[in-house]
Amino acid sequence: ELGWEVTSLEMRRNGWELSSQVKTVREAIDNDGPFDVLMGSSFGGLAIANAVKEYSEDLRLVLLAPAFGVYDTLSEQIGDSELGEWKKVGIKTFHPLGWDEDVSIPWTFMEDARRLGWPEVNHRTVILHGLLDDVVPIESSRVFMRSSPFVEIVEVDDGHRLGESLELLRDLVSMVLD
């Protein structure tokens, strides 16, 4: 309806770890680009922010409730004992919001989350984040915004899935393209 050509990535094609998702984004940029705008939500937004730091060309990002600081967020949500058990066993089962089935996540995911949770971005970026997000705290996006002069944030009365705010996408894209 907006007349946009969209390339949708299978983010887990190379694995669940964040570094694998970063690889997926870089492959798309290298093989299918150039793109006018790179857009991702939650872990996809975090993967895009990490992927673009290696590129000097002018890339534009729209990130929807990006999972910045995911190591700290998950650690707080599951607690020290479960975190220790996950590290010891090497795998943990989660039931992601909106999914029909459980997902088993390797501990290497958390190792990546610690290393890649706060990327440096030198590309024009707009973040859309809901004030009611109960998955990724909005404060994570605020901290990220303060770390770069290239980042703006739009805060909305919405949750993590941003279902009530998708009509803003056209404006967000305009913000990074203007």
Question: What residue ranges belong to the model's regions?
Answer:
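Active-site signature of alpha/beta-hydrolase-fold catalytic machinery across serine-
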Residues: 50-54, 143
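Generic hydrophobic alpha-helical segments
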Residues: 21, 25-29, 48, 169-176
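Active-site catalytic motif of lipid deacylating hydrolases and related acyltransferases
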Residues: 1-32, 160
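The alpha/beta-hydrolase serine catalytic core
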Residues: 37, 58-178
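Gly/Ala-rich beta-loop-alpha elbow adjacent to hydrolase catalytic centers
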Residues: 39-48
